[in-house]
Amino acid sequence: MSGVNEIRSTFLDYFRDAGHAVVPSSSLVPKNDPTLMFTNAGMVQFKNVFTGVEKRPYVKATSSQKCVRAGGKHNDLDNVGYTARHHTFFEMLGNFSFGDYFKADAIELAWTLITKEFGLTPERLLVTVYADDDEAAGLWKKIAGFGDDKIIRIGTSDNFWQMGDTGPCGPCSEIFIDQGPALAGGPPGSPDEDGDRFLEFWNLVFMQYEQVEPGVRNPLPRPSIDTGMGLERMAAILQGVHSNYDTDLFRALIDAVAHAVSRAPEPATRASYRVIADHLRSTSFLIADGVLPSNEGRGYVLRRIMRRAMRHLELLGARDPVMYRLVPTLVREMGRAFPELVRSEALISETLRLEEGRFRKTLERGLAILDAESRDLSAGQNLSGETAFTLYDTYGFPLDLTQDALKARGIGVDTQAFDAAMQRQKQAARAAWQGSGEAATETVWFGIKERTGATEFLGYETETAEAVVGALLREGGEVETLKAGDSGIVVVNQTPFYGESGGQVGDTGTISGPGLKARVTNTEKKLGDLFVHHVTVEEGTLSLGAAVELKVDHARRSAIRANHSATHLLHEALRQVLGDHVAQKGSLVAPERLRFDISHPKPIDEAELTRVEEIANAVLLQNAPVVTKLMAVDEAIESGARALFGEKYGDEVRVVSMGRPVDDEGWEVEGRLPNFSIELCGGTHVSQLGEIGQITVIGESAVGAGVRRIEAMTGTAARRHRATESRTLSQLAGLLKAPVADVPERLSTLIEERRRLEKELADARKKIAMGGASGGGDEAREVNGVRLMARVVEGVEMRDLKGLADEGKSRLGSGIVAIVGVSADGKAGLVVGVTEDLTGRYDAVGLVRAGAGHLGGKGGGGRRDMAQAGGPDGHGAEAALAAIAEALAAA
């Protein structure tokens, strides 16, 4: 029972049998929790349950939570690989009570699990409790039979947990194991507590107070329990090893690394193998949860982890991408517990392969510069911060990678100077931005917004509205009026026009008044909530302070609404067909069509696209109302609404819910959530799904590494597209004199027949060419003591000439072959071949260049035994062969 997978199962099964709901791990990307870069503890997904904001259908839960600590204040990156227990990715086993059981049951459950199920010897165990927690100390004496020597009272924050300055809080009790006197270190609370002898593996948090303000705590009416056990630590304990990296899971990953680099681990390289094994887990799980490498936010942390692992692969001798080859081992070891790894295996592998290929050049350049700059430094000295910043800024070499590369030599980095250089760059960038023409145009909006305030958007409820003109601009500057023929920008106090954002294009329409007509050609948003209308005045004068009527182009808005709602249906259908790794990476919602970019590592085949389209249309046909609701952002996320990665949300968000869940065949089913699609979205949408009409996917293509683009149409545009396709298919059927259903097979047969005939024709031309043609007599002639076979061949492409030359050389045995091929469009290709016995005397490159000029070409290239050239003038074929013969005669 000591394997990692068995330990996880035993823990979860034990608490399931004790009445706990087994809850799957939440994503590593917290659901709109601005305080966290990544999920770093088991309680994160239950945070709102503990605070009472959210209700769930269970009061006891257990989970094995994926956690990452590699960014923000929870950052173990620098220590990973160099200690026995630091990781960027780890699993936290936990059991939770939301007002059900409390200390006595929590301690009883924990003690029974570790001594009965896991079989730990009680004599090796000890615990800590908070200094004032007499209740917990008494329970440990009663349940475990511990004396005071086994119950250590700690008065510091290590044994008192709180969520923040206010909210639930309470004392902790940590469980330790004595790993024996062979390891250094003393018990918790002693001066030597940082040693490895006494290992903490489970923390029980007793949430019994609510902190209303610093120093003021009130008892909670329903105390709760939050526990956390490190799976990797427990595996090391049960497997009798003192390092997490010696457990079965890490041994498998390290063996895979050793196989990939064809090198067994040694004491000097041990840290590199550990870094790679650890970082493989964190990078793979982050990608599976929708994070892709980038230069900011979570994507940048992912890139740093990737590049640190890749640098250690380079230390082990790898010169080609390796990390992607390790993914199958990880999936085999952890895929059963975390099926998202299986679903995302292709995306993970391709992302790692591409990123490692890109980083190879950066790594080579950066390490060369780092080596040169640090050559004269010795242990205890620091690399200059300016040099470290140059590596970062110019060569894309992260600071932590520089620090890691120098760590083995005992050399540090002047981080203060690095930070100062970074600050100077930011200041220079801001100054450059303010001095640019674009900036001069953009800064005008600050003054306008300060004067007029934000624009009130009315477009969710209406397409017409009256408003007052608050600002007019022409050619980047404010003006009092816009006259007939003028183009400019209008800012009003309220508007029904949607401003371009979130991938949805801006509205168009009209602004009118007495004697006034202006055409709105686009609408944008500036500074988040200032709507600016691009207009051309067609009649009258548009004046500052005037009352005007705004009217959105209804037909265009309707088409945009349909396309935007369709993107939501397609997004969810794509996730259902391709996997949960699919995340929106960009979109364009226009009246004519929609474009949708997603994270996916390979082309989406026709069968998958068909399933996506069928699922989306099945939901559309429900004609269910599209429900929009304003909610607090935390409440929205907890309700299941999908937040787009990288988007910034305020305290209140708009939640758009569509349709009822369906299976892959389009039949309605009971889903985990009440709606097929629930997203945070500020765009405009249809009121009933049936208004979309139909959804037709018209294309799929690559945008960049790991990103695919879907293009689709809806409504009338989709029907017209289908009608055009249908007419075209009918015309093809008529030309082929076949039923429509037989067109693909008939076309396939014709294409294969054409290929066969083309090959036969090419073969016939080759035979004719080598059997006798103009310019060469029946076989070959002797020039300067060398046999020369020269041919002009009609209708043979350049790609076939080399084969003819090889055949000619084979026939001659010893000699030179020169062939000019003239294509149907009159262009010429020239090939010269020299048999091996003559390459010491004659160079095919020189001979081909002698003839190329007569074909209108320049130069030519190849080897001494085979060279080629081309030109636009096939009429010079005979002259080219004659020139080659002359060059041969003169040699």
Curated annotation (Swiss-Prot):
Keywords: Aminoacyl-tRNA synthetase, ATP-binding, Cytoplasm, Ligase, Metal-binding, Nucleotide-binding, Protein biosynthesis, RNA-binding, tRNA-binding, Zinc. Its EC number is 6.1.1.7. InterPro entries: aa-tRNA-synth_II/BPL/LPL, Ala-tRNA-lgiase_IIc, Ala-tRNA-ligase_IIc_anticod-bd, Ala-tRNA-synth_IIc_core, Ala-tRNA-synth_IIc_N, Ala-tRNA_ligase, Ala_tRNA_ligase_euk/bac, DHHA1_dom. Binds 1 zinc ion per subunit. One of its GO terms (molecular function) is tRNA binding. Its cofactor is Zn(2+). It is found in: Cytoplasm. It catalyses: tRNA(Ala) + L-alanine + ATP = L-alanyl-tRNA(Ala) + AMP + diphosphate. GO terms for biological process: alanyl-tRNA aminoacylation; negative regulation of DNA-templated transcription. Its main location: cytoplasm. Signal peptide: none annotated. Pfam families: DHHA1, tRNA-synt_2c, tRNA_SAD. CDD domains: AlaRS_core. One of its GO terms (cellular component) is cytosol. Zn(2+) binds at H564, H568, C681, H685. It is an enzyme of class 6 (ligase). PROSITE patterns: AA_TRNA_LIGASE_II_ALA. Consists of three domains; the N-terminal catalytic domain, the editing domain and the C-terminal C-Ala domain. The editing domain removes incorrectly charged amino acids, while the C-Ala domain, along with tRNA(Ala), serves as a bridge to cooperatively bring together the editing and aminoacylation centers thus stimulating deacylation of misacylated tRNAs. Catalyzes the attachment of alanine to tRNA(Ala) in a two-step reaction: alanine is first activated by ATP to form Ala-AMP and then transferred to the acceptor end of tRNA(Ala). Also edits incorrectly charged Ser-tRNA(Ala) and Gly-tRNA(Ala) via its editing domain. Belongs to the class-II aminoacyl-tRNA synthetase family. This is Alanine--tRNA ligase. It comes from Methylorubrum populi (strain ATCC BAA-705 / NCIMB 13946 / BJ001) (Methylobacterium populi).
